[in-house]
Amino acid sequence: MPIGTPSVPYRLPGSQMERWVDIYTRLGVERILFLGSEVNDGIANSLVAQMLYLDSEDSSKPIYLYINSPGGSVTAGLAIYDTIQYVKSEVVTICVGLAASMGAFLLAAGTKGKRVALPHSRIMIHQPLGGTSRRQASDIEIEAREILRMKDMLNHSLADMSGQTFEKIEKDTDRDYFLSAEEAMAYGLIDRVISHPTEA
């Protein structure tokens, strides 16, 4: 039985009255964002808007992006990635559970020195996926060229973010490549493994 989005009490600054807001709204007040699903256009638009708002409110404070995601759309993920790079605020990325595919890419995209994972997190990198349902050969060829272009761009970005060579990234992402939190740190996808929020 689904429980829905939990609500929590929140007191507006300067007010004596509390009101109930959904947990994500309350976390957003503390500059905490959560990517807890597959990456799609709706999720990306929401995260981009929240990051832009928080950055415009106070770019001297970090934004915390918690990630527990199986990945998803490359183009939607790149919108989030570009925004992480665009905002002046430091973006602390924190893996809780699983950061796979585009989730792992976004984890590695956080501010250097501020990319962390909890001890039992799993991180997985691989090449972008594409599908071909009954379509004309010319359309399949166009899609294949675009997937290869994205694969090359993502691998170059992962190499930059991790410090690994492009060749190693290309080899490792040829198939699903799973890492523990400690292995992801040694690989350069994250900077630290943490077990307490004050360590982030």
Swiss-Prot record:
Alphabetical list of SUPFAM superfamilies matching this protein: ClpP/crotonase (SSF52096)
Xref: Gene3D superfamilies: 2-enoyl-CoA Hydratase, Chain A, domain 1
Cross-referenced PROSITE patterns: CLP_PROTEASE_HIS (PS00382), CLP_PROTEASE_SER (PS00381)
UniProt key word Cytoplasm: yes
Cited InterPro entries: ClpP (IPR001907), ClpP/crotonase-like_dom_sf (IPR029045), ClpP/TepA (IPR023562), ClpP_His_AS (IPR033135), ClpP_Ser_AS (IPR018215)
Pfam family, one: CLP_protease
Subcellular location: Cytoplasm
Keywords: Cytoplasm, Hydrolase, Protease, Serine protease
GO CC annotations, alphabetized: cytoplasm; endopeptidase Clp complex
Molecular function, one GO term: ATPase binding
Domain of life: Bacteria
GO aspect biological process, one term: protein quality control for misfolded or incompletely synthesized proteins
Reactions listed under catalytic activity: Hydrolysis of proteins to small peptides in the presence of ATP and magnesium. alpha-casein is the usual test substrate. In the absence of ATP, only oligopeptides shorter than five residues are hydrolyzed (such as succinyl-Leu-Tyr-|-NHMec, and Leu-Tyr-Leu-|-Tyr-Trp, in which cleavage of the -Tyr-|-Leu- and -Tyr-|-Trp bonds also occurs)
List of catalytic residues: 101, 126
KW Kinase (keyword) present: no
Quaternary structure and partners: Fourteen ClpP subunits assemble into 2 heptameric rings which stack back to back to give a disk-like structure with a central cavity, resembling the structure of eukaryotic proteasomes.
Function: Cleaves peptides in various proteins in a process that requires ATP hydrolysis. Has a chymotrypsin-like activity. Plays a major role in the degradation of misfolded proteins.
Family that this chain belongs to: Belongs to the peptidase S14 family.
Protein name per its UniProtKB record: ATP-dependent Clp protease proteolytic subunit 3
Organism: Synechococcus sp. (strain CC9902)
Gene name of the encoded protein: clpP3
